[in-house]
Amino acid sequence: MNGAVPMLAIDGPSGAGKGTVAGLLARRLGWNLLDSGALYRLLAFAAVNHGVDLTNEEALKVLAAHLDVQFVAADGSHGQRIILEGEEVTDVIRTEQVGAGASQVAALPAVRDALLQRQRAFREAPGLVADGRDMGTVVFPDAPLKIFLTASAEERARRRYLQLKAKGADVDQSALLEEIRERDERDSQRAVAPLKPADDAILLDSTEMSIEAVVETIIRHCERQGWDV
């Protein structure tokens, strides 16, 4: 790990707004962006496309090591376009089905190990904003600033419902709430890199906060680090 490069680690459960907040912060700071969840979504998506069973740990490990993926800076809520094997999959990998698959493969030790160095390679000058579920605990334990961003399951389901409805999807909010609760349990109970705040993380509950308020709150913490914002 390149500890000389400043970085901000943002962890939290599904639907807490990590991706949107991280993208906005990366643009504000002029730093690189790592959406670690996208890597697991990409792996799950690629596995299905290549006929690899999501329980086949060895095959998934090989696939993870050879993912042909590019992250291209762009406007929008996630701050980047994602290209897999030459095709843009930015929106395709954001479905609930792919998310469930990502949570499944993320529980496999060999998969997490295969993607670990790939994630750490994103830490380059002038800095990095990384979001995920184990950024501050496993991937970048030396990050000088760690945020654990959360919100109530009900609020996260509401946000996801509005997001999907805006895209024209036919979704049921109660079903989304159940999926979020199931994923929370799966992510927090897995044996490897379970979802939990780092001991030195700042806890931030965004249930009653706007995205803008969350960003400004984190920016104030960045200023305390002496970073140029």
From Swiss-Prot:
Q: Which GO terms describe its cellular component?
A: cytosol
Q: Per its UniProt record, what CDD domains does this chain match?
A: CMPK (cd02020)
At the top of the EC hierarchy, this enzyme's class is: transferase
Q: What InterPro entries does its record include?
A: Cytidylate_kin, Cytidylate_kinase_dom, P-loop_NTPase
SUPFAM superfamilies, sorted: P-loop containing nucleoside triphosphate hydrolases (SSF52540)
Superkingdom classification of source: Bacteria
Q: Which GO molecular function annotation, any one, does this entry have?
A: ATP binding
Q: Which keywords describe this protein according to UniProt?
A: ATP-binding, Cytoplasm, Kinase, Nucleotide-binding, Transferase
Biological processes, Gene Ontology terms? nucleobase-containing small molecule interconversion; pyrimidine nucleotide metabolic process
Tell me where it resides: Cytoplasm
Reactions catalysed, semicolon-separated, are:
CMP + ATP = CDP + ADP; dCMP + ATP = dCDP + ADP
* EC numbers, comma separated: 2.7.4.25
Q: Could you say which residues bind ATP here?
A: G12, P13, S14, G15, A16, G17, K18, G19, T20
Similarity-based family: Belongs to the cytidylate kinase family. Type 1 subfamily.
Q: Per its record, how is this protein called by name?
A: Cytidylate kinase
Q: Please report the organism this UniProt entry assigns to the protein.
A: Pseudomonas aeruginosa (strain ATCC 15692 / DSM 22644 / CIP 104116 / JCM 14847 / LMG 12228 / 1C / PRS 101 / PAO1)
Gene it is expressed from? cmk
